[in-house]
């Protein structure tokens, strides 16, 4: 709904796809407030998560070539990004940052598989940070609420980065979004 979108100061007037995504995703001001409240307690735990993430990436023959030459700077960038998931702000700048991330990935020739794998790792590991000991300090939030807020935000990040890949592919092929959608959803089988 527009109330959710406006409460986060994301202007979707010229972005129908983002408006539609956010209307289904449901990330709202209460989610943002939860993540921001947890941030000071979560922030010290994020460096270990970054290390675990890059250990996994470096162990992968498919992913290692994309990071091996700049692991230290990428770890710093990743850590700043994970902190932003909790600190915000969740506004037009947040949208622009994620579009920029997609553009950088394109320039670096980082495949969409990397983003999807990264987000899958975070969806599995980040909710583990919401321990009972941490949540005791925040009686207004339970594990399910905190996890839902975080997962909604990670999904939004992936949507914003992924669509940069699709937009680039459309530009490369010289096709419109409507044709791209038709090509993606058309069946290769002819009706019998």
Model-derived segments and their meaning:
Residues 28-40, 102-110:
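Short, charged, low-complexity loops and linkers
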Residues 24, 32-65:
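N-terminal "first-domain core" detector
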Residues 3-33:
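Charged, compositionally biased N-terminal leader segments and the immediate start
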Residues 44, 48, 52, 73, ...:
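Short, well-structured alpha-helical interface segments that form or flank functional binding sites
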Residues 53-86:
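Structured interaction and signal-relay segments at domain junctions
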Residues 17-20, 30-37, 62, 73, ...:
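Exposed alpha-helical structural elements
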Residues 3-10, 24, 83-192:
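Long, amphipathic alpha-helical coupling/dimerization segments that relay conformational signals between
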């Amino acid at each position: 709904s527009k109330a959710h979108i406006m409460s986060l100061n994301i202007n979707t007037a010229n972005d129908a796809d983002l408006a539609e995504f956010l209307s289904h995703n449901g990330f709202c001001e209460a989610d943002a407030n939860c993540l921001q409240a947890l941030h000071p307690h979560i922030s010290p735990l994020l460096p270990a998560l970054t290390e675990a993430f890059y250990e996994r990436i470096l162990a992968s023959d498919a992913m290692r070539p994309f990071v091996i030459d700049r692991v230290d700077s990428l770890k710093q960038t990743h850590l700043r990004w994970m902190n932003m998931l909790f600190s915000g702000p969740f506004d037009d700048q947040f949208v622009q940052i994620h579009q920029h991330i997609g553009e950088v990935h394109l320039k670096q020739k980082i495949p969409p598989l990397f983003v999807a794998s990264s987000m899958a790792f975070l969806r599995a590991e980040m909710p583990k940070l919401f321990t009972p000991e941490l949540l005791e300090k925040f009686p207004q939030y339970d594990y399910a609420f905190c996890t839902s807020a975080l997962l909604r935000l990670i999904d939004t990040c992936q949507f914003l980065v992924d669509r940069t890949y699709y937009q680039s592919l459309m530009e490369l092929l010289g096709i419109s979004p409507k044709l791209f959608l038709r090509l993606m959803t058309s069946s290769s089988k002819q009706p019998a």
